[in-house]
Amino acid sequence: DGKKVVIGANLDDKKFDVAVGLALHEGSHIKLSDFTLLRNLENSIPQEIYVLGEKMGVDRYTVLSTVKSILNYVEDRRIDSFIFKTSPGYKSYYHSMYEKYFYSKNVDKGLLSDEFRTEEIDSYMFRIINLHNKNRQLTALKGLKEIYETIDLGRIQRGLMRDTNEAFN
């Protein structure tokens, strides 16, 4: 809702750093993300994107959901980069979170395998949300290299993406 972060009560010592990293990340969304833009995202997406989706057999809701997921990925990288630069004491928690969700053996296996190589939304989304993983395969899907270059993780990591609106555009 853009106002609070809820953490589950079932935390053991092994999961604590991951949970703290996730809570810090989600809390940073509250401080840094533009929730007005996110609430109005459906109307911010150019109509031609919906038309293109329809031509490819993708309904309006799926277009919206996909754009929202990609925006969230870019926004996550922007926020995490900001926190890394401004709050270095939190890095270990973020590293724990990244190890669990992005750099796990299962993610690496999926990226290196023949899976998620069909030109459909799920394959693209798996590959996109793991573009910052060293095992990304930019030739796994048509256009993935261009998507990677458009997102420009290096620019984000240098702190050159200022806000949610810039992440969207």
Region locations from a protein language model:
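Short, functionally important secondary-structure microenvironments
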Residues: 1-169
